[in-house]
Amino acid sequence: MSEMNVTERDPATEQTAAGLSTTRGIATRLSFDPSERERLRSLASRVAELAARPIERKKAELWTEHNDLRSAVPVIFCDPENGWNEIVPASSLQCSDPLARVWEMHLLKEIFWAVEMLDDRVIESFFDVPYNYEDTGWGLHEKRIGGERGGSYTWEPPLKNYERDFPSLVYPKIIVDKSMTDRVLDLARGLFDGILEVRL
């Protein structure tokens, strides 16, 4: 069981269906202890085993037919979104390093999708690492009201007065931290070597 204080920001609970869009802001040691490595490699092995099933190839064919507008049957994609935090509660994660927790959550979601969800989402033998980046934003910032713990929220639109506010809008710049991206990528490759293909 993790010793992370539940009041701290836990990036493992902030994932979408595609995982996290960046590793920026995750306070990781970039080195996992032996129990974390064993846990992650074990989960990755299970994902690889599930990805090798013939049904995954069939699901990929269904999606190709669907995207080519030739599908004879509908394809189903289920994503519990914030429900993931109930399906896989943060308190059930065994890793303590924040990045290890993100990866553990991701692998557990893949396993749940394959074993319990039983939709047409393809389980693949890849482990994708996102770029470590920041963006400069649009120049105006929304104010959210509510939304604690992934709940619903309303927001105040940042563009309230066209004449006054529009000139503040700018195109965001994406700034990639190549060094940190490479370090996280190397960590994943060393961890999942021979189990899952690590991709950037």
Question: Where do the model's predicted regions map?
Answer:
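Catalytic cores of TIM-barrel enzymes
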Residues: 2-200
